[in-house]
């Protein structure tokens, strides 16, 4: 009897899993569905770049990241969209964040040796390391930083497309549009159902198509709460993003810059060679979009991505943070317009662990979610671990970290760079110029 899996969502988790299952011939039929073609506008990874770095205070994530980075470097397709530009990270004024970074750096040196990182103990040393970049920058004299010259970024939208093409080559079937837009789970028994268990469900899409499957993987990113009651295990959060367009001459000046990461303010990527855009993202303020649901009393209000018309403006605090960052690090660009602004919606968990587990109320549904803003780097290898969870082979260490929690509430992380969580509907939006 043939076995079928339906993967709902063609972002990082969904595509990586589709490729892994197809390579291993774990299912006879693999169907991946989404409302939009890859890269979907609803995917957090639909962007020009995402950071790829190994620093984690948790050793198991660090090892997972190093494994992924080897694949970024050596995979024939993915290496073409991976850029190892290095990352300059300033030391936070927040003691919890500073402690997190200290532990992460110690872990990396433990695994790779002291040469893995370069410590810069003053603004003078930072300028000496990057003389052309920071010659006019008013850096604080006591500013300290750490450089990882082996970190980098990948073109995230292009990476998703490459994985889709790989999956197609391996025989994965893709369905987009209304026939691929998840609507709900239904109990709709097919002739192949033996026990007719009411907890064995099928997928119904927007146009009424019903997909029967032995196994379903729900990998819908920030939209999970719209389809499934997770009892607040995950929360959709919006992160502000903007860009600066460089001229050809400016591109020559900034093309060799590292990622500059200031956890107290914002961060910036080198200009992408094709578009010559520098991407900026602010830290400190995150946004939720709370809506009422018909879930149980404990989940009456959940956050899902804002579904109204997208705003061409940004929250006021985000612009303030980005401008402060530019004034400090890239003053020659400080008066430039912020363009292509958007909110990048992620699926966040309180402890930053992913949610990769069987959904308790169903017999045949698994979930891969909770990217928490750091999952993209694992695009080359996370599918292997999701597949292991589906097939029952995942290590106990990862099973415990990624389990579906109900009674045991996860511990909130104090090191996160979040000063305030603001409801999207209450945020003050403004135009940059």
UniProtKB/Swiss-Prot annotation:
Localization per Swiss-Prot or TrEMBL: Secreted; Cytoplasm; Nucleus
GO annotation, biological process: L-lysine catabolic process
Signal peptide: 1-18
Catalysed transformations (reactions): L-saccharopine + O2 + H2O = (S)-2-amino-6-oxohexanoate + L-glutamate + H2O2
InterPro entries, A to Z: FAD-dep_OxRdtase (IPR006076), FAD/NAD-bd_sf (IPR036188), MTOX (IPR045170)
Residues carrying sugar: 24, 119, 188, 229
Cited Pfam families: DAO
Cofactors that this protein relies on: FAD
Enzyme class, broadest EC rank: oxidoreductase
EC assignment: 1.5.3.18
UniProt KW keywords: Cytoplasm, FAD, Flavoprotein, Glycoprotein, Nucleus, Oxidoreductase, Secreted, Signal
GO molecular function terms attached to this record: flavin adenine dinucleotide binding; saccharopine oxidase activity; sarcosine oxidase activity
A single cellular component GO annotation: cytosol
The protein's assembly and partners: Monomer.
Family classification: Belongs to the MSOX/MTOX family.
Name used for this protein in its record: L-saccharopine oxidase
Organism: Schizosaccharomyces pombe (strain 972 / ATCC 24843) (Fission yeast)
Lineage of producing organism: Eukaryota, Fungi, Dikarya, Ascomycota, Taphrinomycotina
